[in-house]
Amino acid sequence: MNNLIDTIKKIENILYSLERILKQECHNLLKSKTSNEEILELIKRKKILFKKLIILSQDRLCLEKEYNIFPPYESNNKLNNYWKKIINTCLILRKLNLKNKIIMNKKFYLNQRFLELSSSYKKSVTYNLDGNLEI
C-alpha cells in the first residue's frame, strides 16, 4: 500500500510542476518580446513531465490491481485526500491550458494577419503610365 501512496505523491508532484510550467508559459506568451526558443524550451520540459506522468500512471494502475483498490479510494482516507488534490490540480491545469491556447491562437493569428497584410501591401496591383497592370 505504501508503494501506491508513494506513486500517487509522485504524480501529485509532477502535476504541480506542470502547473508551474503552464503559468510560466502563460506569462511568456503575454510578454511581447518572448522568443520562440523560450516557449519551445517550456514545451520540451512539459513533454518530459508528461512521459514521467504516463509511466507513473501505469504503475499506479498495476498497484491498484494488485491491492484491489480503485479511485476515489473511499476505504483509505490518506489515498482519498491525495486523490482529491490530484483532481483539483488537474482541473487547474485544464483551465491554464485552455487560457494558454487562447493566448497562443490570438498571438499567432495577429502575426499571421500582419504577414498577410504585409505581403499584400508589397504585391499591390497598380496601373503604369501606359495603362497596363503592374504587380
From Swiss-Prot:
Which InterPro entries does the entry mention? FlgN-like, FlgN-like_sf
GO:BP terms for this protein?
A: bacterial-type flagellum assembly
> What keywords does the record list, in alphabetical order?
Bacterial flagellum biogenesis, Cytoplasm
Q: Please state where this protein is localized.
A: Cytoplasm
**Which Pfam families has this protein been placed in?**
FlgN
Q: Name one GO cellular component term.
A: cytoplasm
Task: Please give the superkingdom of this protein's source.
Answer: Bacteria
Q: Is the keyword Nucleotide-binding in the record? A: no
Q: Which family does it belong to?
A: Belongs to the FlgN family.
Its function, per the record, reads: Required for the efficient initiation of filament assembly.
Q: What is this protein called?
A: Putative flagella synthesis protein FlgN
